Regions:
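Hydrophobic helical membrane-anchoring modules
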Residues: 1-4, 173-230
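Acidic helix N-cap motif at the loop->helix transition within catalytic regions
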Residues: 20-24, 45-56, 95
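Short, acidic, metal-binding catalytic loop of nucleotide-sugar glycosyltransferases
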Residues: 27-36
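A conserved acidic beta->alpha catalytic loop
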Residues: 28, 42-50, 90
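Acidic donor-binding/catalytic loop of UDP-sugar-dependent glycosyltransferases
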Residues: 48, 88-102, 173
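Glycine-rich, basic loop-to-helix element that forms the pyrophosphate-binding segment
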Residues: 62-78
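Short aromatic/hydrophobic "clamp" motif used to bind/position activated sugar donors
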Residues: 83
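Conserved donor NDP-sugar-binding/catalytic core segment of glycosyltransferases
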Residues: 95-123
Length: 230
């Protein structure tokens, strides 16, 4: 893994009970080309996530639970010029850092994200891979897509708002006001695990939450509605 003392990109990974994904995550990060650092931000895992990450040579910090607080904690310690927020079950292409550098060569660009395909030979994965391009065209954005941002832009925005859900959509909306948000054609590979065995119900529920969010319903209220139903 080409982790250096002066990385161009800081890869920030929020985790909670991800012991089964850590070895594959570490292996995929080891295939990246370029200078980077990795900060795993754990929100109090009850399994062996922290131990597994350290065994794989990853730097781990502890942070208040919640993706927003965890990613903000990682960003505060990051030293890269670019911040890349990566879910533990999302896999980047080997030349991901080259795509990011190309996007940010445009001085108007404030950051961006990757397109997505969903891994696994399942009906859920195939359906999500077909659906996602239309969601992206409609302005829907999720953290699975490996959002990246210039460090100075992220700092000026005050980082992630510490919402329990839709913290990624909120950051995207605010970043767009700061400059050009680059939607890369290059694909990251996300997991369809939360949809497996209950695709229609989960997709319908999440779509409803998305519509309510775009209508202006507060994410804290949406989370209270969402938690008992998921």
């Amino acid at each position: 893994m080409n982790i250096t003392k002066h990385p161009l990109v800081s890869i920030i990974v929020p985790t909670l009970n991800e012991e089964t994904t850590i070895p594959e995550l570490a292996a995929s990060l080891g295939r990246l080309r370029g200078d980077f650092e990795v900060i795993v931000c754990d929100g109090g895992s009850a399994d062996a996530t922290v131990e597994m990450a350290r065994q794989c040579g990853l730097r781990v910090i502890e942070a208040p639970r919640g993706r927003g607080p965890q990613m903000n904690a990682g960003a505060r310690l990051a030293i890269g010029e670019t911040l890349l927020f990566l879910h533990a079950d999302t896999r980047l292409p080997e030349n991901a850092l080259e795509f990011i550098a190309g996007a940010l060569a445009d001085e108007r660009a404030c950051g961006g994200n990757f397109s997505l395909i969903f891994g696994g030979d399942t009906r859920e994965a195939r359906a999500l891979t077909r659906i996602y391009p239309f969601l992206r065209l409609g302005g829907m954005l999720y953290g699975d897509s490996a959002i990246f941002a210039r460090r100075d832009v992220f700092d000026r925005l005050g980082g992630y708002r510490e919402y329990p859900i839709f913290e990624d959509c909120d950051l995207y909306q605010r970043m767009r006001r700061m400059g050009r948000f680059v939607r890369l054609n290059a694909c990251a590979t996300a997991s369809s695990r939360r949809f497996e065995g209950r695709f229609i119900r989960t997709f319908a529920l999440w779509s409803l939450m998305q519509v309510l969010y775009w209508l202006g319903v507060n994410p804290n209220l949406l989370n209270r509605l969402y938690k008992p139903l998921r």
